[in-house]
């Protein structure tokens, strides 16, 4: 479905969260890509953080941003695989008030178009 060009563009303030036990500011390519894309699309970077694969740490960072009026959206990368250390979805469930039914399926379908069956390795 195309974007409705008659609607005004409304930029949002986005916080980028990288969840990883190994990434640092110098090698967080996924976080860098997200920042580049949000800026090129006209949005603002509200904040950025890298946290370990620990549910309490993730929740703490999310709560900080949820309570920050200068953050409209949080986009996360990492910690969504199927290993025991991948706990990002569970951490998000602890702070989310509403689920968006179908979003995960749509995201995986779009991913499947690009990376094939490897998309099943992400939740």
Regions inferred by a protein language model and the residue ranges of each:
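Non-catalytic beta/alpha edge segments that cap or flank active sites
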Residues: 1-123
């Amino acid at each position: 479905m195309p974007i409705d060009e008659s609607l005004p563009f409304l930029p949002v303030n986005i916080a980028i969260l990288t969840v990883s036990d190994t990434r640092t500011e110098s090698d967080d390519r996924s976080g860098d890509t997200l920042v580049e894309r949000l800026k090129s699309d006209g949005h603002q970077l509200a904040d950025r953080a890298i946290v370990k694969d620990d549910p309490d740490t993730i929740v703490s960072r999310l709560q900080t941003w949820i309570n920050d009026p200068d953050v409209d959206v949080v986009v996360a990368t990492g910690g969504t695989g199927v290993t025991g250390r991948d706990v990002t979805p569970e951490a998000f469930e602890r702070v989310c008030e509403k689920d968006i039914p179908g979003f995960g399926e749509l995201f995986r379908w779009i991913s499947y178009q690009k990376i094939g069956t490897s998309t099943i390795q992400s939740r």
